Amino acid sequence: VDKRIYVAPARFSGPRGQGGQEEGPLNGLRLVVKDLFAIKGERIGQGNPDLLASAPIERQTAPAVLALQQAGADYRARTTTDELAYSLNGTNGHFGTPQNPRAPLRLPGGSSVGSAVAVARGEAEIGLGTDTGGSIRVPSSYCGLYGLRPTHGRISMTGLKPLAPRFDTVGWMTRDLATLTQVSEVLIPETTATRLPARIILLVPEGLAAGPYQRLLGPLSRRLESLGFQCERRMLSQAFMARASEAFRILQGCEIRRTHQAWLNTPEQGPESRWPRLNPDIAARLKWCMTLSDSDEQAAEAKADTVRRWYRQQLAASHEGGETACEDGSAAAHTQAEATSEAVFVLPTTPGASPLLGASLEVMEAYRHRLMGLTALAGLNGAPQLSLPWLTDDAARLPEEAAPPPWGVSLMGLPGRDESLLALARMLED
């Protein structure tokens, strides 16, 4: 058993198909679960050995896990997470970094890293995790998986250790869309009538080098138009993405400070300290969270409001000539704007393929800001986002890599439109 991936193996070595606790639509599908969920008889470690050692044994299983088991899923193992789920890299200095099965020279992505790698290796069909700032979407992109961040608040977070409750969601990853849809039907049972959008907005991030994503847009537009959708292209300015990233980073930091204040407010060292041993990068981020003020939070909230207004204006109504994420980060609609039907965004899940292993902290921090310029959009809006393994990053491929590394493309919609994203993806893959 690879301890970089698995914290508490259950029946990991058994054959597939022996069933879960119940007969149901997920019968015979192996389930692995991120080390943030309560599972009866196990401890929650949150990616930290000190927290694991001091954690109580759980008396109940989290409702999200229990729902999958009752639908027939076969729970196999608890999987590793980046420490406190506060990273998108898939690294953990305590337990090691799991190898990305699709790109061994590159990061696997986090923080739901163990679940992603287990599924990508074929050791499970369902990888349950969480997504706050991208922890389902990013490893899905890097490992070539399907991954869904559902609408915030749609699935119970009971029995989970939080990071930033305002943004935390349950999420899941699979190797195929059919399984992802099956899991969605179990975890999002209160399904309303699926409303397909009339418009698809193809977002092109400013500064994204010409390559696989842009080459996809032509054939994708033709395919969508053949299915009756109206396609529009819009640019995401660097200034707008920076505004979204910074707003999310500060609001998330304020939430994290409140989540962990019981021990963050104690001395870092000495007899009164309640701090666990932390990796240096995570410790530095937590210390930064402690510096945030009420005025910082208010300023970030104002920035987030501009992002939210733009998001809803884009998706809730079409505009003659379109609407652009302007250089100042505001949403500027043309005066002849006319409300019609809803839309869905298409965008790259990440700025490209996964970064290489061994990149410096400075390089990774700069990359994290670019990455969060994309992932923050769903987080700030409480919106669903579906990452699809439709691309490989040919331009990033190194001579020593056997194949081009994976790169995800996302569908992203208004809150509550999770089923619409899944239905649209099925239409495009048929």
Predicted feature descriptions by range:
Residues V1-A124, G321-E327, H334:
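Gly/Ser-rich catalytic/binding loops embedded in alpha/beta enzyme cores
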Residues L29-P49, I250-D305, C326-G329, A333, ...:
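Short helix-loop capping/hinge segments that flank enzyme active sites or metal/cofactor-binding pockets
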Residues L31, E185-C254, T266:
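Gly/Ser-rich, acidic/histidine-flanked active-site/gating loops
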Residues V33, Y75-T80, L128-T130, R233-R234, ...:
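General beta-strand structural signal in soluble alpha/beta enzymes
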Residues N89-Q99, R243-T259:
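Charged, often glycine-rich, active-site loop that binds/positions anionic groups
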Residues G93-G96, G144-G147, I250-L251, V363-E365:
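Short, hinge-like loop/turn segments at secondary-structure boundaries
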Residues R121, I126, T132-G207, A383-D430:
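Structural helix-boundary/capping segments
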Residues S295-D430:
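Glycine-rich, small-residue loops and helix-cap segments
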